[in-house]
Regions:
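Acidic, Gly/Ser/Thr-rich repeat motifs that build Ca2+-stabilized beta-propeller blades
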Residues: 1-111, 165-185, 198, 233-271, ...
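Blade-edge beta-strand/turn elements of extracellular beta-propeller
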Residues: 2-22, 59-83, 122-162, 215-233, ...
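Conserved strand-loop elements at the edges of beta-sheets that form or border functional pockets
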Residues: 94, 158, 294
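Acidic/polar, solvent-exposed loop segments in beta-strand-rich repeat domains
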Residues: 110-122, 138
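Extracytoplasmic, non-cytosolic globular domains
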Residues: 117-130, 154-187, 191-192
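Acidic/polar loop patches that form or flank catalytic/metal-binding clefts of enzymes
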Residues: 136-141, 175-178, 197-204
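Mobile, glycine-enriched helix-loop/loop "lid" segments at the mouths of ligand-binding/catalytic clefts
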Residues: 192-220
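Repeated scaffold domains used in trafficking and secretory/extracellular systems
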Residues: 287-291
C-alpha cells in the first residue's frame, strides 16, 4: 500500500494474495526499493508462495499509473522450503554496496532438524548477497564461498535460526542482525558491513549459551552476539534500525529493537563488539511489535500485529 501526502491510497500498489500463503509464519515478509527506484521504479518483494517456498520477485510501477505495479513480476530467487511452515526469514534489503541481501530462516522445526543453518550447501539459515542488475541474479565475485565445491556462492553469512530483520548502518559501517531464538535466548549481532563468511552459531549455540543448554559445545570460529536476553523478557526479537534522523539528534547511532511477546521498545549503541548505553523506553500500550520502518529522512516507525503504525518521536 502507498501513503501519499498522509493519505492511504485506495488501490494497493501490489496484491499477491492469490499467489502467496499466510500459513504458519508465511506471507508477505518484506519489500525493498531499488537504490535507483526514482529512475527504474523497481520494487523487490520477499514472500512465501502457496507451496511454502521463499520467493523474491521484482516488480515495476505501471507506466500508466506509477502508484500501481505492473501485473507481471520478474523472478529473482526461489528457495524450496518444503518441510515446515515457519522460519521463512527475515528481510530483503539493498546494502551500501548496491547488492541485494536476503536473510532466510533455517527451514523450520525445533532445533533445526534438517541441520540447514550450518550446511553451506543449503541456502536456509543464511544471509545471501546477490547482484540483481541482470535478472535473475549474478554472484558477486567478493562473496566468501565463490568457487568452493559443495558451498553455495550466494552465501554471505550463516548459522542463523530466523533472523527477524537485519539493518545496515552505512555511517557506522555496521550490519545489525536480530536472530530469533528457540526457547532460551534472543540475540543481536553487529558486525562490519565488510565482514563476510561469518558463522553466527545456530544450532551450536543459542545466543551466548550452548544449544541445547545442557550440552557442551565447541565455539571455535563462531561469531558471538553483542547482546542476548532470556525469555523472562520476551520470546521473539524484532530488529529495527539505527537512528540517523534529524528530529532527535541525541539518538543518532542508536539501534532500536523490540520483542513480539515483550511489547517493549529498547535501544543500544554498538562499540567494539559490545552493546553499550542500553535504554528501555517507555512504550505506551501498542501491541505485538512485528517490524520497524525507516523513512527517507531517517525517522523510525514501529509496526504492530494489530495493524497499527506509529512514528518514534520525542515525548
Amino acid at each position: 500500500r502507498i501513503v501519499q501526502n498522509g493519505i492511504l491510497l485506495a488501490a494497493p500498489f501490489l496484491d499477491l494474495s492469490a499467489r502467496g500463503s499466510t500459513a504458519g509464519e508465511g506471507g508477505l515478509l518484506s519489500v525493498a526499493l531499488h537504490p535507483e527506484f526514482a529512475v527504474n521504479r523497481w520494487l523487490f518483494v520477499h514472500f512465501t508462495n502457496t507451496a511454502g517456498d521463499i520467493l523474491v520477485e521484482r516488480y515495476a510501477a505501471s507506466i500508466v499509473d506509477p502508484n500501481i505495479a505492473q501485473t507481471a513480476g520478474t523472478p529473482i530467487v526461489a528457495i524450496p522450503h518444503p518441510t515446515f511452515n515457519n522460519h521463512n526469514g527475515g528481510r530483503v534489503a539493498f546494502g551500501p554496496d548496491g547488492m541485494l541481501y536476503l536473510s532466510t530462516g533455517d527451514g523450520g522445526g525445533a532445533g533445526d532438524p534438517d541441520r540447514n543453518a550450518q550446511n553451506l550447501g543449503s541456502l536456509l539459515g543464511k544471509i545471501l548477497r546477490l547482484d540483481v542488475a541482470v535478472p535473475p541474479y549474478m554472484i558477486p565475485a567478493s562473496n566468501p564461498f565463490v568457487s568452493q565445491a559443495g558451498r553455495r556462492a550466494e552465501i554471505w553469512a550463516y548459522g542463523l535460526r530466523n533472523s527477524w530483520r537485519f539493518a545496515f548502518d552505512p555511517p557506522g559501517a555496521s550490519l545489525f542482525i536480530a536472530d530469533v531464538g528457540q526457547g532460551q535466548r534472543e540475540e543481536i549481532n553487529a558486525v562490519p558491513t565488510s565482514a563476510s563468511g561469518l558463522n553466527f552459531g545456530w544450532p551450536v549455540t543459542e545466543g551466548t549459551i550452548c544449544f541445547p543448554a545442557s550440552a557442551a559445545c565447541d565455539r571455535t570460529g563462531l561469531q558471538p552476539p553483542i547482546l542476548d536476553y532470556d525469555h523472562a523478557q520476551g520470546c521473539s526479537i524484532t530488529g529495527g534500525y539505527v537512528y540517523r534522523g534529524a528530529a532527535m539528534p541525541e539518538l543518532a547511532g542508536r539501534f532500536f529493537y523490540s520483542d513480539f511477546c515483550g511489547g517493549w521498545l529498547r535501544s543500544l549503541r554498538h562499540m567494539s563488539g559490545t552493546a553499550t548505553e542500553r535504554v528501555n523506553w517507555n512504550l505506551p500500550t501498542f501491541g505485538a511489535v512485528v517490524s520497524f520502518g525507516e523513512d527517507v529522512f531517517g525517522e523510525l516507525y514501529v509496526l504492530a500485529s494489530n495493524g497499527r503504525v506509529a512514528r518514534i518521536v520525542r515525548n
